[in-house]
Amino acid sequence: MEKREEITKRMKIILEKMKNTEKEKVREMERSYEQTWDVAVAGGGVSGTAAAIAAARCGARVLILEQNGYLGGTLTGCGVGPMMTFHAGETQVIKGIMEEIVQRLVKRGYSAGHVHDTTRYISYLTPFSAEGLKLILDEMTEEAGCEVLFHTFIGEVE
């Protein structure tokens, strides 16, 4: 009986050491991921991604937190398209990074560019390949130096 109690006691000590070791490993992992950014963007939809690219191009250290495994939000993941708000009548009013995205899509064959809408619902629309847009957004965020965390939900901000 004494031998059994001694073995049990030793096993408890070993298990406690293992538990402490695992806790320390977790703490070490948490410490290794402690970083700071100038800008954190909640959501890598097209607007969030464009904002992140703009901030990174201005020299900010940028982190995009995206719940899906891709950038572009509903434009790339939900079949929302074509893009339709670049023009007010015949005047193009949306330019900048969004126009750069369209030009890259056109150059790679993922879009025909801004096309006159013959139904007169809107003046121009911009059809595109959702998979092509995902690729372009990935490339542009990488070029700008943005860091992206996919499959990430925001639970708390300090």
Q: What are the residue ranges of the model-derived segments?
A:
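Conserved N-terminal/central alpha/beta ligand/cofactor-binding core
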Residues: 3-19, 23-29, 54, 60-61, ...
